Amino acid sequence: MDKHGVKTPLWRKEVEDPEAREEDLEDDSSSSSSSSSVEERSDPESATETEEDSRDAEEREARSVSYSPLRQESSSQQVALLRRSDSSFWGWLSPFALLGGLAAPADRKRGAPEEPCVLETRRRPPRRGGCARCEILFCKKCKTLHSHPAYVEHCILEHPDLGKAEATGNSELIDSQPPSPQCSKLFYL
């Protein structure tokens, strides 16, 4: 603790040599013996005055508030300092550590990338031998149904199943038959 009663952080304290401490103790003991002999020679009133003065000073210090802010480094700065001071086996990796900081930090608030429109993506062939032009697809981006531009024309006039029925000449058969399996998915979305 310093004279104001504030704890000093360990990283602020200076390391003293044991030899220097011994020299200080010797200097203190020689100066205290000379000062004690001077005090003995002076009268007792001056000794009590100095004691009272020191007590008054201590009381004033106890009543006063001193502000001594502690300087703290962020954890990233501490890590950087530790990396710089580390000259062991991993010291040769320091160029790679510097390159790691160049990457842009990921934006966690950004959600998943938006899905492209069904019309913009390449579609795979329909299942069970269905007709690609007869498909109606729901687009998550547009939130609507998409179909081929010639959907109606193709399904009514060009569809191979309907063409076979017309070739037989039974128009009643067309009306009474359920839709073919290829086109049935159009009605059950």
UniProtKB/Swiss-Prot annotation:
InterPro entries: DUF4637 (IPR029174). Residues 1-77 are annotated as: Disordered. This is Uncharacterized protein C17orf50 homolog. Residues 65-77 have a biased composition (Polar residues). Residues 1-15 have a biased composition (Basic and acidic residues). Residues 16-29, 46-56 have a biased composition (Acidic residues).
